[in-house]
Curated annotation (Swiss-Prot):
Catalyzed chemical reaction(s): D-erythro-1-(imidazol-4-yl)glycerol 3-phosphate = 3-(imidazol-4-yl)-2-oxopropyl phosphate + H2O
Protein name: Imidazoleglycerol-phosphate dehydratase
Gene Ontology CC, one term: cytoplasm
One Pfam family it belongs to: IGPD
Keyword Amino-acid biosynthesis applies: yes
Family: Belongs to the imidazoleglycerol-phosphate dehydratase family.
Top-level taxonomic group: Bacteria
Native source organism of the sequence: Corynebacterium diphtheriae (strain ATCC 700971 / NCTC 13129 / Biotype gravis)
One example of a Gene Ontology biological process annotation: L-histidine biosynthetic process
The enzyme's E.C. designation: 4.2.1.19
PANTHER family per UniProt: IMIDAZOLEGLYCEROL-PHOSPHATE DEHYDRATASE (PTHR23133:SF2), IMIDAZOLEGLYCEROL-PHOSPHATE DEHYDRATASE HIS7 (PTHR23133)
InterPro entries: IGPD_sf (IPR038494), ImidazoleglycerolP_deHydtase (IPR000807), ImidazoleglycerP_deHydtase_CS (IPR020565), Ribosomal_Su5_D2-typ_SF (IPR020568)
């Protein structure tokens, strides 16, 4: 596994958003986040801190309409930056999972840096489709964020809400669980130094 910090830096500009992301997978949880959506900033901060990633996100988008494009496009760019940073995956554990409690809520994330993008989510209460946190973050965007992240990071990601009631707690537990699962998966495998696949490539 490389001794140099694994850093990904991606920019993406469309008619709907301008997103710039830099992530250091070998960081210490230093974050600089500004998306124009305060609750989303809070979630990305938690993602960086609990993943122990150094994370910089600067996003501007059409938030005067809603937060959808900014959140989804940030997930696209973050996923691409993670894929760039992890490189050929040599020496990583590849798999990671984490169960995270937050008061009445328990969420779980399972990840495989397989190179085969796939996303599954289950268990969020139906009312999260209609919930809005902080006046500008509809929790229906949780699924959009994690799906876009998985597809662009080229990982298999399962996000499961085992139980919970508060939309804030459920959302935050999901973000933190995903961060911790990714942190485990990209960590060094002390016993295997090559690419963690019988195919010899991921």
């Amino acid at each position: 596994m490389a001794t140099q910090p694994r850093i990904g830096s991606i920019s993406r500009v469309t008619s709907e958003s301008d997103i710039r992301v830099e992530i250091n997978l070998d960081g210490t949880g230093t974050v600089e986040i500004d998306t124009g959506v305060p609750f989303f900033d809070h979630m990305l901060t938690a993602f960086g801190v609990h993943g122990a990633f150094d994370l910089k996100v600067k996003a501007t988008g059409d938030t005067h309409i809603d937060a959808h494009h900014t959140v989804e496009d940030t997930a696209i760019v973050l996923g691409q930056a993670i894929a760039q940073a992890v490189g050929d995956k040599r020496g990583i554990k590849r798999f990671g999972s984490f169960q995270l409690p937050m008061d009445e809520t328990l969420c779980e994330a399972i990840v495989d840096f397989s190179g085969r993008p796939y996303f599954v989510t289950k268990g969020e209460p139906d009312y999260l489709v209609h919930s809005v946190i902080g006046s500008h973050y509809p929790t229906v965007l949780n699924e959009h964020f994690f799906e876009s992240l998985a597809l662009n990071a080229k990982i298999t990601l399962h996000v499961l809400c085992r139980y919970g009631r508060d939309p804030h707690h459920i959302t935050e537990a999901e973000f933190k669980a995903v961060a911790r699962a990714i942190r485990e998966a990209v960590g060094p495998d002390d016993r295997l130094t090559g690419i963690p696949s019988t195919k010899g490539a991921l």
